[in-house]
């Protein structure tokens, strides 16, 4: 029998961008934009996986995609719960590796205009399940999110 466990963690990442809150928000609101900046680091080298892909950016809508990295099929499955244009996104998502659920998270992304652009604050609460990503799972997720936001900075430049 598989040993069951949960690691709970919350992290907050704040980034300042020289782009309006509206422009930063728009980078999350279209599949084409997210595809341009969302895959970074090692995962940028991953192959797209076959299977259902969705990008339904509305409250109750789903975002779903997958890729294959080092022979493992990763799947991301999200549901949007709150969308306030140019101000806030709240969604939950599950991550899978070869069909095994690795984690369930709630992400809140806030966009605030400033004189020089905007500030994005990403708050994520995660439940990392059954030790599949090891004891460093929260740090790995935060690092991956930080890399992704670096990709957003390059996209907005």
Describe the predicted segments one by one.
Residues 8-14, 50, 62, 75, ...:
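Intrinsic-disorder/low-complexity, polar/charged segments enriched in Ser/Thr/Lys/Arg/Asp/Glu/Gln
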Residues 12, 32-73:
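Short beta-edge strand/loop motif at the mouth of beta-sheet-based domains
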Residues 64-92:
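Helix-adjacent hinge/juxtasegments
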